[in-house]
Amino acid sequence: AAVRAETPFGEIRLEDWRRVLSIVLDGAFLCTQAALPHLVKAGGGTIINIGGLTAHKGADGRAHVITAKAGLAGLTRALALDLAPHHITVNCVVPGTIETMRGLPGAPERPQHRRSLPPVGRRGEPEEIAAMVRTLCGPDMRYVTGQTIHVNGGNLMP
């Protein structure tokens, strides 16, 4: 889940903290629980969580978002172990700066966005994230599980 919440840590209210963690972590938990019986019945499958780059880089005013997305990476690893006996792989794809409704091509560019372009010199396209998800869901990727895969144009190279 994409959560846009920028608040200095000292100003984050407990209700906002819990809301962000609920959107990200409860959302992944509930989706996985809903899908699990169907995946088990099918004899296996793939779960892909969508992480956040700030969980790996940090960012001002986003402690609650960073904590939630880092928790999602942990949940991915835990589920990979728990669900492996059911032939279910679980991975996390972490997009970089992507052309979305938040960064429409015709919208005026904010100076910090121009500075924050990745080494490839452009924002990614949603189709590039979809391609990674599609690849991870393919039959050639049954041995890949518990991984956090960054698709970010070189913005972070762990």
Please provide the spans of the model-predicted regions.
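Alpha-helical segment proximal to the catalytic Tyr-Lys
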Residues: 37, 81-85, 142
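Active-site loop immediately N-terminal to the catalytic Tyr-X3-Lys motif
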Residues: 10, 57-63, 85-86, 121, ...
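Short, small/polar-rich loop/turn modules that mediate ligand/substrate recognition or access, typified
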Residues: 84, 89, 144-146, 152
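Substrate-binding pocket helix/loop in short-chain dehydrogenase/reductase
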Residues: 8-9, 16-18, 103, 114
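A conserved structural motif in NAD(P)-dependent oxidoreductases
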Residues: 118-129
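Residue(s) in the substrate-gating loop at a strand-loop-helix junction
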Residues: 52
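Active-site helix of classical SDR
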Residues: 32, 68, 76
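Catalytic Tyr-X3-Lys loop
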Residues: 3, 10-29, 48, 65, ...
